[in-house]
Regions:
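Well-ordered secondary-structure scaffolds
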Residues: 1-266
Length: 266
């Protein structure tokens, strides 16, 4: 039996890591917040919190209570649990923790939370608050394992997709109630209204958009633009997510290999 992995976060990048780990036979439990705000929710196992169940690229994720985790894992399903991180640590005692919340800072993950602790993206330092960091910035170092030092700092500039950076990310201009008028996979024209924050229109061409009915803060990310206009991309795990997921899987398998080597030497 492979060691249990606890994944903090169920967004699109975390889901790429969950997919890679599941394909390699690792049992994974996702820890999500009660009201997730992922943009690309069609490719997020954490969307099971809203739907009850989420199917993504052959694997099923299900929103369950902590008491149901063991039975859910036995069914080959990915449990998505909204209990506190501390409660999951105490109850499940995972061998591996992956923090893929992507908040650009460490929200409480500690190196002694598990035998192997992995941080995804900026906000972590390999060999300090986590054992290893996975690079998330697009480019040459994407998906690399960093055992000594931090990931590249957040630049605040979205990665280049289809020739666009700042233009492809849409933020709210005020706090209020967000209501979507367009949906994931819709093709829209530039400046077309895709939704409202209260009565203020939001305009863009989108591949992802927040679930309607959420209260958002000022400058909250509402939508993600993809000028490539490939509808299938809206429903499949992205190249970036899989690259980061590959880095997570490498860190896990390298740790297992080294642990087994140490055991053979005894």
């Amino acid at each position: 039996m492979k060691p249990l992995v606890l994944m903090r976060g169920g967004g699109d990048i975390a889901s790429g890591a969950v997919y890679r780990l599941k394909r390699a036979g690792y049992p994974v439990v996702i820890n999500e917040i009660a009201i997730p705000t992922m943009i690309r929710r069609e490719v997020c196992y954490g969307n099971a919190v809203h739907r009850g169940e989420m199917i993504l690229e052959r694997f099923v994720a299900r929103h369950v209570a902590l008491s149901e985790v063991a039975d859910t894992l036995a069914q080959g399903v990915i449990p998505v649990v909204t209990s506190s991180y501390e409660e999951l640590l105490d109850t499940l005692k995972p061998a591996i923790v992956v923090d893929a919340i992507l908040s650009k800072k460490n929200l409480g993950t500690k190196r002694d939370d598990a035998d192997l602790v992995i941080g995804v993206g900026p906000g972590f330092t390999g060999g300090h608050d986590v054992d290893v960091v996975i690079e998330t910035m697009r480019g040459h170092y994407l998906g690399r394992c960093i055992y000594d030092g931090p990931a590249q700092p957040n630049t605040g500039i979205p990665g280049n997709v289809g020739g666009y950076t700042h233009e492809r990310v849409i933020h709210s201009q005020k706090a209020g109630l967000f209501t979507a008028k367009r949906h994931i996979g819709d093709s829209v024209q530039a400046n077309e209204v895709i939704g409202y924050v209260d009565k203020e229109p939001v305009r863009a061409k989108i591949t992802g958009i927040l679930k309607s009915g959420l209260i958002v803060s000022d400058h909250f990310k509402l939508a993600d633009v993809d000028a490539r206009c490939e509808e299938a991309h809206c429903y499949s795990i992205s190249d970036k997510s899989l690259a980061v997921g590959g880095g997570v899987l490498e860190a896990v398998t390298a740790w297992e290999y080294e642990r087994n080597q140490d055991g053979n030497d005894l």
